[in-house]
């Protein structure tokens, strides 16, 4: 699957054919009929829409013929949180999930997915906004782990954590000021929260 789709007809067809579009970039103040239709389709799918200047679109464009719209498409299909929990149930294991708070670098996301797979995690949860999605770079860096590790995308990571707590899960955050992991009893239904490269775990998630 292509990582990026450009041009009005191609982008509209991507939405209508059911492709998983992570982000849509639209020329700011462009309000003609085809663009309005694309925006309407994007909102139906709850896609992140970024209204940007022409210079930004030109910078992102791989073809030089974006016509004011660029869609970034997930290289892999997303799972749901329930899919991840079901995977744990099928194995007869307590859920073990990695939750990533605004990871921006695709190489980092791919490496974390690889680590999650090696650690025996049942899946990874990422937020829809302010974070990289499942690009081809992520897939390549994961070294095949993306084929075995489901990734779910949620609107509100903090809310998802609260819902999982009700399911009996508990959570630890990777934090420079925290305790040594060797001093903790890391057993049972558990989630590991990893924060942004620069800011760490956000206050709302902590």
What are the language-model segments listed below?
Residues 10, 34, 56, 156-160, ...:
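Short acidic active-site motifs
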Residues 11-12, 32, 77-79, 106, ...:
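Glycine-rich nucleotide phosphate-binding loop and flanking beta-alpha elements
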Residues 60-75, 142-145, 150, 187-195:
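Short basic, glycine-rich beta-strand/loop surfaces that mediate nucleic-acid
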Residues 172-206:
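Active-site/ligand-binding-proximal alpha/beta "capping" segment
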Residues 13, 41, 115, 163, ...:
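Hydrophobic/aromatic ligand-binding patch that stacks against planar heteroaromatic rings
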Residues 3-6, 79-80, 104-107, 152, ...:
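Short secondary-structure boundary/capping elements
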Residues 16-19, 86-179, 183:
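RNA substrate-binding interface of SAM-dependent RNA methyltransferases
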Residues 1-87:
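N-terminal positively charged helical leader segments and presequences
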């Amino acid at each position: 699957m292509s990582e990026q789709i450009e041009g009005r007809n191609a982008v509209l067809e991507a939405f209508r054919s059911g492709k998983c579009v992570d982000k849509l970039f639209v020329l700011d103040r462009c309000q003609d009929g085809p663009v309005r239709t694309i925006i309407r389709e994007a909102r139906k799918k709850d896609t992140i829409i970024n209204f940007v200047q022409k210079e930004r679109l030109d910078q992102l464009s791989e073809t030089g013929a974006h016509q004011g719209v660029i869609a970034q498409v997930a290289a892999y299909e997303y799972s749901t949180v329930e899919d991840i929990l079901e995977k744990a149930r099928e194995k007869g294991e307590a859920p073990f999930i990695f939750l990533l708070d605004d990871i921006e670098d695709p190489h980092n996301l791919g490496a974390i997915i690889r680590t999650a797979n090696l650690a025996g995690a049942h899946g990874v949860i990422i937020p829809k906004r302010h974070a990289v999605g499942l690009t081809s770079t992520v897939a390549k860096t994961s070294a095949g782990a993306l084929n075995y590790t489901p990734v779910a995308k949620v609107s509100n990571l903090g809310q998802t954590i609260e819902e999982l707590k009700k399911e009996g899960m508990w959570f630890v955050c990777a934090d420079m000021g925290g305790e040594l992991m060797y001093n903790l009893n890391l057993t049972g239904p558990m989630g590991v929260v990893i924060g942004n490269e620069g800011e760490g775990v956000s206050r709302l998630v902590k």
